[in-house]
């Protein structure tokens, strides 16, 4: 029998399955909608590998901290609906927990045991793809530690404890009051969430990025027709402004724009009761760098039926 676009659309809405799966199910069951739903359900985990080709750009950032260590993980899903699912949220939280006992990179976390299970993180996520019905990607993971001090954390737009769309870790080295250091660290983490600095210090900025900016500023300055010595000063001024915008310690502190982050850190040493130093930070924003697929639903249905 021939399968209509209306049937494919209805089955997709009932099952949440993909277009081609819905078309195959209807063909196998002679258009019986209930039987087609059952046919898809029986596929179960077997659908997981097929889903692995679909773009997963939604999902959640998870953060877990313990003592002087903290981790960020990003697990993507195809839709925000699944990201709000309790089961998906548990997976993100547990993967972050597992990451604490590893070096923190995706490879080491993936082969570690999933909390409360004899399966690895990688296998648990693959099983969940079939159960939840969407492609899921363990995209990235990072760990930040400090020998003496604290690692402050911040989740922006939190949907649950330790879960949200943007996460930040900040390591502060100090022998002073940890609660005061954590409080200031959280403020810095919020600042980083808002400003997205490229590096901690000017020396840490990628050399290629610096040269690229310098070349752009030089070309712009030469268009003014001014002498070369004036152009050099113009470029120096613009590069100074560039570093003020992208270097964490040089940025105007969001909580008090009258001082830089470095000056705010010096001021915070009064409440911390000892010298303090920011030794590193990590910022994950959900889906950054992932190109989301924009699908014409009507065209997708038509293509599936014709295909």
Swiss-Prot record:
Associates with the EF-Tu.GDP complex and induces the exchange of GDP to GTP. It remains bound to the aminoacyl-tRNA.EF-Tu.GTP complex up to the GTP hydrolysis stage on the ribosome. The gene is tsf. The keyword Cytoplasm applies. The keyword Protein biosynthesis applies. This is Elongation factor Ts. It is found in: Cytoplasm. It holds the Pfam family EF_TS. HAMAP family: EF_Ts (MF_00050).
């Amino acid at each position: 029998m021939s399968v209509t676009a209306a049937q494919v659309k209805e089955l997709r809405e009932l099952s949440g399955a993909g277009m081609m799966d819905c078309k195959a199910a209807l063909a196998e069951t002679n258009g019986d909608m209930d039987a087609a739903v059952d046919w898809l359900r029986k596929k179960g985990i077997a659908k997981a590998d097929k889903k692995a080709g679909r773009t997963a750009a939604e999902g959640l950032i998870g953060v877990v901290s313990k003592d002087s260590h903290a981790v960020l993980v990003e697990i993507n899903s195809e839709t925000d609906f699944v990201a709000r699912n309790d089961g998906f949220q548990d997976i993100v939280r547990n993967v972050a927990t597992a990451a604490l006992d590893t070096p923190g990179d995706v490879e080491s976390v993936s082969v570690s045991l999933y909390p409360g299970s004899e399966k690895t993180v990688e296998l648990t996520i693959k099983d969940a793809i079939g159960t939840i019905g969407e492609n899921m990607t363990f995209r990235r993971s990072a760990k930040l530690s400090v020998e003496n001090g604290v690692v402050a954390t911040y989740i922006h737009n939190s949907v649950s404890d330790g879960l949200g769309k943007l996460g930040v870790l900040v390591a502060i080295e100090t022998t002073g009051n940890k609660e005061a250091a954590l409080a200031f660290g959280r403020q810095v983490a919020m600042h980083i969430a808002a400003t997205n600095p490229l590096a901690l210090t000017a020396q840490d900025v990628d050399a290629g990025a610096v040269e690229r900016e310098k070349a752009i500023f030089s070309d712009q300055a030469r268009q003014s027709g001014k002498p070369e010595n004036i152009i050099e000063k113009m470029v120096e001024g613009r590069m100074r402004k560039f570093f003020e915008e992208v270097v964490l310690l040089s940025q105007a502190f969001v909580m008090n724009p009258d001082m830089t982050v470095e000056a705010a850190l010096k001021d915070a040493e009064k409440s911390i009761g000892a010298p303090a130093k920011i030794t590193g930070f990590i910022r994950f924003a959900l889906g950054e760098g992932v190109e989301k697929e924009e699908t014409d639903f009507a065209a997708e249905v038509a293509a599936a039926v014709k295909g």
